[in-house]
């Protein structure tokens, strides 16, 4: 709840900063002659940004849950291996190799979380530069990026609430 409201404040700051930079194009050359940035739904790039932004929280959640499953499978295989190779574990005469299991789990978790970690960093860049290349307009690119951010904010709140209620978070 409060994180979602905080994110909405950040979106308002994004829109406010865009207006400021566009109005002061002489001071900020990248924004010179950018024109007005509109988040109107009549702009197809805004709609595309909303659709792409709505997808990202679900994609992130799906990839992250798959990563957890793969890491869990790796640890199950390690435990089975230790039971096979050290039959005294069940009898209490041998100790399991906890260090190897923890090391294996840590490596698997780090390896599996690379793509979900890159997704929030690379997706906004793809939106901005993709729209910029297609439309040739910085104003459309910034509008699509703003719509993307707004959709991510709204959908991530819903995904977080849903995952909390079903025990996935």
Swiss-Prot record:
Bilayer topology: Multi-pass membrane protein
- Which reaction is this enzyme known to catalyze? diphosphate + H2O + H(+)(in) = 2 phosphate + 2 H(+)(out)
Q: Cellular component GO terms, alphabetically?
A: plasma membrane
Q: Where is this gene product found?
A: Cell inner membrane
* Principal location listed in the UniProt entry: membrane
Q: GO MF terms on file?
A: diphosphate hydrolysis-driven proton transmembrane transporter activity; inorganic diphosphate phosphatase activity
Q: Which residues cross the membrane?
A: 45-65, 114-134, 141-161
Q: Which cofactor does it need?
A: Mg(2+)
Per the UniProt entry, the Enzyme Commission number(s) are 7.1.3.1
User: Key word Membrane present in the record?
Assistant: yes
Alphabetized Pfam families for the sequence: H_PPase (PF03030)
Signal peptide location: none
Q: Give the intrachain disulfide bonds.
A: none
Return the broad EC class.
translocase
Q: Which UniProt keywords apply?
A: Cell inner membrane, Cell membrane, Hydrogen ion transport, Ion transport, Magnesium, Membrane, Translocase, Transmembrane, Transmembrane helix, Transport
> In which domain of life is the source organism classified?
Bacteria
Which family is this protein grouped under? Belongs to the H(+)-translocating pyrophosphatase (TC 3.A.10) family.
Could you tell me what this protein does?
Proton pump that utilizes the energy of pyrophosphate hydrolysis as the driving force for proton movement across the membrane. Generates a proton motive force.
* Quaternary assembly: Homodimer.
- Name listed for the protein in its UniProt record: Pyrophosphate-energized proton pump 1
- Say which species the protein is native to: Rhizobium leguminosarum bv. trifolii
Q: What is the lineage of its organism?
A: Bacteria, Pseudomonadati, Pseudomonadota, Alphaproteobacteria, Hyphomicrobiales
Gene from which this protein is expressed: hppA1
């Amino acid at each position: 709840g409060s994180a979602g409201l905080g994110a909405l404040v950040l979106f308002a700051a994004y829109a406010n900063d865009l207006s400021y930079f566009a109005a002061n194009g002489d001071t900020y050359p990248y924004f010179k002659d950018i024109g007005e940035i509109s988040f109107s739904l009549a702009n197809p790039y805004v709609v595309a940004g909303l659709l792409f932004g709505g997808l990202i929280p679900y994609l992130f959640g799906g990839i992250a849950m798959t990563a957890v499953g793969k890491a869990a499978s790796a640890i199950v295989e390690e435990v089975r291996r230790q039971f096979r190779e050290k039959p005294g574990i069940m009898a209490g005469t041998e100790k399991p190799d906890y260090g190897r299991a923890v090391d294996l789990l840590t490596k698997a978790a780090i390896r599996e979380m690379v793509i979900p970690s890159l997704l929030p960093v690379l997706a906004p860049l793809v939106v901005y530069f993709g729209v910029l290349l297609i439309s040739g307009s910085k104003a459309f690119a910034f509008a699509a990026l703003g719509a993307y951010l707004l959709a991510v904010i709204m959908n991530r709140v819903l995904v977080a609430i849903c995952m909390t209620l079903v025990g996935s978070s």
